[in-house]
Amino acid sequence: WSKIDIDVCGPLALQRCLIVYPWTQRYFGSFGDLSTVAAIMGNPKVAQHGVVALTGLRTALDHMDEIKSTYAALSVLHSEKLHVDPDNFRLLCECLTIVIAGKMGKKLSPDMQAAWQKYLCAVVSALGRQYH
């Protein structure tokens, strides 16, 4: 995590997710104009939520032995109030991995990527737990 700039990678990951998977935009109706790539890339609410999402993702590091309970409230919020399709967590994590790979280049070794993917899978599972 020390190599990840949350203020840069968070917005880039969410922007990429909204552009590559446009159906994910339906959960962000209150964010204003998301009609074009330029609108998404310049939207301060998208950028802010990207930081929030990555900050939340970072929380799991401090609670590795209790990831599911750490994300229990967020799981309930996203499933029962926001009605977010849990597959969107996976899509966002895929976009985040691409952003991080772009930033780190060759420094992101296969072993590091494997550990990163395992971490993300645990968090995505915890966030989707309420849906099961």
From Swiss-Prot:
Which Gene Ontology BP annotations are present?
Answer: hydrogen peroxide catabolic process
Keywords from UniProt, A to Z, are:
Heme, Iron, Metal-binding, Oxygen transport, Transport
**GO CC: one term?**
hemoglobin complex
Q: Name one Pfam family in it.
A: Globin
Q: Does the keyword Transport apply?
A: yes
Q: Where is the Globin domain?
A: 1-132
Q: Where is the signal peptide?
A: none
Q: Where along this sequence does the record place binding of heme b? A: H49, H78
Organism's domain of life?
Eukaryota
Task: Name the organs or tissues of expression.
Answer: Red blood cells.
Q: Which GO terms describe its molecular function?
A: haptoglobin binding; heme binding; metal ion binding; organic acid binding; oxygen binding; oxygen carrier activity; peroxidase activity
UniProt cross-references to InterPro entries, sorted A to Z = Globin (IPR000971), Globin-like_sf (IPR009050), Globin/Proto (IPR012292), Hemoglobin_b (IPR002337), Hemoglobin_oxygen_transport (IPR050056)
Q: Please tell me whether the keyword RNA-binding is annotated for this protein.
A: no
Name the PANTHER family on file: HEMOGLOBIN FAMILY MEMBER (PTHR11442), HEMOGLOBIN SUBUNIT EPSILON (PTHR11442:SF7)
Q: How does it assemble?
A: Hb 1 is a heterotetramer of two alpha-1 and two beta-1 chains. Hb 2 is a heterotetramer of two alpha-2 and two beta-1 chains.
User: What role does this protein play?
Assistant: Involved in oxygen transport from gills to the various peripheral tissues.
* Protein family: Belongs to the globin family.
- Protein name, as recorded: Hemoglobin subunit beta-1
What organism, scientifically named, is this protein from? Answer: Arctogadus glacialis (Arctic cod)
Q: What is the lineage of its organism?
A: Eukaryota, Metazoa, Chordata, Craniata, Vertebrata
Gene expressing this chain: hbb1
